[in-house]
Every structure is written in C-alpha cells, then in structure tokens.
Amino acid sequence: MMSVQKANTVSRQKATGAHFTPDKLAEVIAKRILDYFKGEKNRVIRVLDPACGDGELLLAINKVAQSMNIQLELIGVDFDIDAINIANERLSRSGHKNFRLINKDFLEMVSEGDNYDLFNIEELEPVDIIIANPPYVRTQILGAEKAQKLREKFNLKGRVDLYQAFLVAMTQQLKSNGIIGVITSNRYLTTKGGGSTRKFLVSNFNILEIMDLGDSKFFEAAVLPAIFFGEKKNKEYQKENSNVPKFFKIYEQSDIEASSSVNSEFNSLIELLEVNKSGLYSVEDKTYSISLGKIISPENYKEPWILATEDEYEWFMKVNQNAYGFIEDFAHVKVGIKTTADSVFIRSDWGELPEEQIPEDKLLRPIISADQANKWSVSLVGNNKKVLYTHEIRDGQIKAINLEEFPRAKNYLESHKERLASRKYVLKANRNWYEIWVPHDPSLWDKPKIIFPDTSPEPKFFYEDKGSVVDGNCYWIIPKKENSNDILFLIMGICNSKFMSKYHDIAFQNKLYAGRRRYLTQYVNKYPIPDPESIYSKEIISLVRELVNNKKETQDINEIENRIEKLILRAFDIESLKY
C-alpha cells in the first residue's frame, strides 16, 4: 500500500511537474557544462537553477567545479519552502559558502507588461550558467486560465507546457555566450507541436548537444526526458557557429536479436552516458541501443529534427531521393472517432440492455480498437463491440441524427443525458448534447481502408472493408479519389516492413517506454512510397493481397514478408537495411 508521504509526493509531482534529478545524472550534466569553462579559473562563475528543489543540481555542479578548480556562485530558486530548506541544509553541509537561495516562483519574478523578458536586476542578475530540471506540466493539468496567462506573458504559441515558459524565462536570465543545460520532455524534438520550441531554441542558442534519454528510466518522470545543451547567441555580435550540434540517444532494446549482439557490458546505467561509440550495450539483464551523431535541423521549424549517425543520415537521404512520393501524395491519413464518452457510446453488451433502450440496428456499427490490431488483417468473429453512431449524411452534409426517428436510441441517450450534456465544449460548438464529438464522414466507413494503432512496438497496419468504424486510439488510411485501392496494398506492404520501421526510427525518433513507437498522422504521412507502377511495387501489391485474403501458417507468412522486404529494397534501389 502506498504510504501517505509517498502519496503526497506523487500528488505534488503530478500537480507541479517536479521530479528530482539523481545525483550521478546531475554530475554528468554538470561536467558537460563546465567543460566549456575550463579556462575560466580567475573569475567567479555565476550559476542558476531556477527550479532547484532540494539542490541536487547545484550540489553536483559545485562538486565537479571543485575537481576542476573553478569558482562558482550558486543561486537557487524554488517556490517550495520545504525544498529550499533542504537545499540550504545540504549546501551548508557541503562547505560551499557562496550560495543564495530564493523562495519564489521563478516565473513570477519576470516583469509584467511588454518587457516580459526583463527580470528585476536587483533581485536576480544575469548568470553565466543555467543548470535545470524545470517542472513539466501539460495544459490539461495547468488549467486553461493558467495556460493562457503563461501564453500571453511568455509569448508562447499553441499548446502550453510549463517547461516552455521556463525555457523563455531562463534564456532571458542567461548572459550572451552563457551555457544552459536543461532537462525537458523529448517531445519537442520530433513532434509537429514542438515546432515553436525548436524555432525558439535555434533562434536563441548555438546548439551544442542534445541527449535523448528515451525510455532508459534514469529517473521517475511522466515523460521521456532529453537534455539540451546550448550557448546563448550574442545578438550584437553574431559569430559563426563552427560546431556541428551533437546528439546522444539511448533506448532500451527488448528483442532477442539485440541482446545477442551486445558490444560490451557495464555495471550501471549512468556509465552508458560516457560511451563514445554507437552500438548495443548491456547493464545487468537489459540491453540498450546507443546512437551518437549529428542533429539535422530543417529550415522549416515545423519539420522534426533528425538525430542520426553519418551512416544513418546517408541511408535516410538515399531513400528519400529514390522515393516516388510520400503517403500524403496518394492517400489521406485520419485519426479515429472521438466520442469523449466511450463508456456511453461504445459497448459490447447492447443486447443486454432493457429492450426499450437497445438502439436501432441502423445506428449500431462495428468498431475496431487498438487492442484488436494485427498485421495485414483482423478477424471480427466474436467481436461484439459496437458504437452508437450518431451521424448520417443528409442533404449531402454530415448531420447529427434526429432522435425522434430513433426512439430506442433516444431512450438510451437520455438515460445518460446528465453526463453527455455536461460536455460544455460540445454545446459551445452549437452541437447537440447527444453527439459524438469527432464523427468523421459517415460515407467513408464502407470504403476499403487501412487501420493501425496509435502506439505499438511493431507495425500493425491491416486491411478492412467490412464497414467498421475506427476507434480514437487508431488511425486509418483511405486512397485519394484519383488512386485505386491497389495503392492501399502497396502502402500496407511498405508500412509493415522492417525497412519502414528503420526509416521511422531515424526520421521521427519517437519511441515510448518498452520500445513502443508512436504512429501519428504527421509521421505516417511522410512515409516514402516507390513508383506504384514499377514491377517491384506491383509484386508487393500482389503479395500483400495474398496475405490479406488467404489465411496462412506462420512460416508461410514469414517467407512472404521476407520477399516483400527484398522487393522494397529493390523498389528504392537500396542495397540493404544496414548502413
């Protein structure tokens, strides 16, 4: 049973985003930062941690600085007085005298009004170094009012996470040519929504290195962490940045093949952060994949950064150069429906309801969810899950059904009216209280489509032509009007291949815990496709049709999949999956 103390800590972490940094990881960050100050032994370097918690990062950088004979002035800020008291006690015990702790909310120390980027200089002077693990709190936990205030105060765009406000505030508090080392979520590296953060970092920093810690679990956190190291640009004197930004990426590998190809073994996870060669490494009974290389930052900030080794980047570029197009050129990729009240609209026990509440057959449609996903095809035998679908095409437009025409559905929905009508966003959008929030075009469900789950450790793209609705934890692909259904079989062959998994990992680097990939519209849209009319593509289409339409033994499936892999390599004129 969770103790009261631990329960309070967990609750506080969720509300504030506070996750304390392990001492060894803190020392790794400190060492990387101070390497840029090796020659600075005749002056005092001012260091700030704007969310210092119990002082771990300040203690770590002080310890490393002592070993390098560098003098520091330490400044810590935190709104939690208990954390400040602990930090004060720990720093005092360390013997370091030149430190100052401030019990305030760092973000509240920013001046109001147009000069949002200016701090009260008397209270907190600009610093040479910022070392930080700022809180990560997403919009839905922050609340709309708080998020809007941060958006206005720090000139933030799109969905607001608390660490973004910290990035802006920290940047303004850092001297020109100062160094920052900050732990954040790794989402901004590869997601469309991270575009504004990428733009901000490129505009304000010479990027030195990014460490993507992936699912390695160096510390307890709700998100996958990354560490950003940058030198603040001097706006008055723009020097040429000769450094090629470096990256370090570590993810756990769970497959058996990986564990048999280990380069060397280590005693602790933290030792892996000092590895200087890409490869597979083991710690106890776990295997980790480490990649070192350079950061490719496209001119368009909306495009994700690519963290690739030289060989990976060369392979990736060759695939793109030899591609005929991308999935978005041939098909539409859509997310599934969003009911925002699944337990009301989606059930497997409709027949067990009172007869007067069992919705009319016309409104109950089979629905496919992520837990049913499989490669190539799925069987709907025994699947009783159906969705009460509240929309139809009327007068050529998508309209909510008229409940008066469906008395049993009306009875059922009215029995849940209190919950459904409490969805204020539905009513605010001038929609009916009983509607599914995102229904999509009802006329498209009967068309052939590819369905795939939003997260999965391996690709699970499968064919569906029985009129099923797609649940919100899945995506679906339908061909554009000018393309035949053949394109679906080519797309499916490409998407389910090891070839495309390799491409996905290089281009999007978005693995979650336990090696699960995220398959979002913005990623799948950018999957390369070979010439659909080539002999290799036509053979891929034929083999995928065979897998979809004929039940086969595992050995036969594996043989066909291997043939598809070879055909894909030929279609893209690539020699192998290896670099």
Swiss-Prot record:
Keywords: DNA-binding, Methyltransferase, Restriction system, S-adenosyl-L-methionine, Transferase. GO terms for molecular function: DNA binding; site-specific DNA-methyltransferase (adenine-specific) activity. Pfam families: Eco57I (PF07669), TaqI_C (PF12950). Its EC number is 2.1.1.72. InterPro entries: DNA_methylase_N6_adenine_CS, MethylTrfase_TaqI-like_dom, N4_N6_ade-DNA_methylase, SAM-dependent_MTases_sf, TaqI_C. One of its GO terms (biological process) is methylation. SUPFAM superfamilies: S-adenosyl-L-methionine-dependent methyltransferases. It catalyses: a 2'-deoxyadenosine in DNA + S-adenosyl-L-methionine = an N(6)-methyl-2'-deoxyadenosine in DNA + S-adenosyl-L-homocysteine + H(+). It is an enzyme of class 2 (transferase). Belongs to the N(4)/N(6)-methyltransferase family. PANTHER family: DNA METHYLTRANSFERASE A, DNA METHYLTRANSFERASE YEEA-RELATED. This is Type II methyltransferase M.BseCI. It comes from Geobacillus stearothermophilus.
